[in-house]
Every structure is written in structure tokens, then in C-alpha cells.
């Protein structure tokens, strides 16, 4: 069931730093493989320590982000969780639980990689954005 318009999803994807260099046409390619979902309060979207396979973009509602059982953040519509899961298999660093009725969409690693395999230009742009993010967040200036 389609919960969101194409434009809503494209605008949300555009705000994700990993996708900042993508054109509207390329964002539409990603939008087409996203699944629209709705869950009730208490539903766990991802659990700390488990390998992540999905990236979540929140549209309406609120989630709690917890590490080692302690709340570290609250996220709402427009926020996103799990972009690293699109790139590599790593354990989740936090548990994310719906606090209110939640509407969101999901992009899986498998579908994302299929788009990258079919479109090397998108892959290059995503890798550039990832490298830029790593450079910005690196606290060691000798890693340049």
C-alpha cells in the first residue's frame, strides 16, 4: 500500500547526506524501491547488536533511540536511521523503537545495491558523499 507520494519520498531522500549529490531522476530510482510502512507504538525497528539490512526514513511519528538500554535520542518526521546498513554489514549501534504511531519508509541493502549495480553513476556519487562524510567526521587530520 502506498502511504506517501513520490514527491514526499524524493524530498526526504534528498535530505539524507549520503544522497546529497543525486539528481531528482536518480532519487526517483531510489524512491521506487522504498517500501512504505506503518507501525504502532512499541514496535522495534532495529535492535542494538543485530546486523542491519535496512535504512529507515521517518515521515510521521516519533521513535526512541537507545544504547545499552538508555535513551540517547528521540527522532521524528524528517529524521533517518541506519544509512550505514546500506553500505556495509555491521551490528546496529542502537535499538530504535516506535513511541507513537509511526509512518516511515524503508530502503533495503539488497535493493539499494541492485540500483548501484545498474547505475555506476549513482554509485560514484554515493561513494563521493560517503568519503566526504568520513572526512568531515574524522578527528584525525593525518587520515586525509
Which residues are covered by each model-predicted region?
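Cytosolic regulatory regions built on CNB/CRP/Popeye-like sensor folds
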Residues: 1-144
